[in-house]
Amino acid sequence: QYLTNGLVINPAYAGTREALSANLSYRKQWARINGAPQFQTLSLHSPVNKKEKVSLGLMADYLTYGVTKDVGIYAFYAYSVRLGHGRLSMGLKGGFDLSNTNYNRLQFPDGNPADPLLTGDMKYTLPNMGVGFYYYTDKYFAGLSVPSLLTYKRDEADQFRVSPDYSLFRTYLTAGTLIRFADVFKVKPSVLVRYSMHEPLEVDLNANLIFADMLWVGGSYRIAEKAAVALLDLQVTPQLKVGYSFDYQLGHLNNYTSGTHEVSLRYEFAFAVSATSPRYF
């Protein structure tokens, strides 16, 4: 999702499209596996004035997996300044994660749960916040973000309490550039690095071929997940872009799933190209 909507991982991305940008996406992970994750996202973000220094945004996401349903609702604030040949955006986000796990929907071989605690519902609402930085020009971009700054632990009373633990942070580093071979042909390579002290380092290598600013054909390789991704986007109008991606597992999961599908739609109101427009990013 971050390839078409950087707001998903970096709050500083808010307003960098220099238009009111509406994004909608749906991701069905690991098709053919019962209870596999399905993820939906709706977001809006835009500069609030012509000087484009302050930007605001909203995002809601809905995740289902197994017997659990998660909802996230977040607001975004970003402030950008001119720096060198581009702009540096600094962003914050704040909101809530709501989760509901219905253990009564679990199915057991003998019809009864082995653990009496695996009955009823577990519901909780937890506030969270994130921070990010994003620098972009018309030729390249770079971003650094920590989408979730608050970490929680469950106590003996089954209540969640804030438990600061920097080792649980997930830090995202992104970078990319635009290589122009001709007016009708461009290449956009990029990379995403996800780091957490208790998880393997994740690296995504991405590349897009852009034809006449209308057709985007690309691919991605996720090293940690051992997954190859095919990407296809169509810029229907200067305002409307639709996309599709297919993830193919190269590891042991390939024996159980037919892949992951994702569709996305972006519409930008009053879109206008400027010298530092990040329309390719």
Regions inferred by a protein language model and the residue ranges of each:
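Subset of outer-membrane beta-barrel
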Residues: 1-281
